[in-house]
UniProtKB/Swiss-Prot annotation:
One of its GO terms (molecular function) is structural constituent of ribosome. It comes from Syntrophomonas wolfei subsp. wolfei (strain DSM 2245B / Goettingen). InterPro entries: Ribosomal_bL35, Ribosomal_bL35-like, Ribosomal_bL35_CS, Ribosomal_bL35_sf. Gene3D superfamilies: 4.10.410.60. Pfam families: Ribosomal_L35p. Residues 1-48 are annotated as: Disordered. GO terms for cellular component: cytosolic large ribosomal subunit. This is Large ribosomal subunit protein bL35. SUPFAM superfamilies: L35p-like. Coiled coil: none annotated. HAMAP family: Ribosomal_bL35. Belongs to the bacterial ribosomal protein bL35 family. Keywords: Ribonucleoprotein, Ribosomal protein. Residues 1-26 have a biased composition (Basic residues).
Amino acid sequence: MPKIKTHRGAAKRFKKTGTGKIKRSKAYASHLLGGKSPKRKRNLRKAGLVSEAETRGISRLIPY
C-alpha cells in the first residue's frame, strides 16, 4: 500500500500540535491594515485552533 500524499497547500497553512490538535493562522492580516485598530492587528498575530468539526478533514490532508 503506497503512502498517502500530503496536500501541500494544507501543509503550508496548518501544523499539528503534540496533542493532535491543528494550529492555524488567522485571516485578514495581510493587507488593508490601515483601517484596523492596533488591538485588532495584535490579536490577528495570535495562532488559532481548527474547530473539532473540521479537524478530521484537515487531518486527512496532512497525515504526517
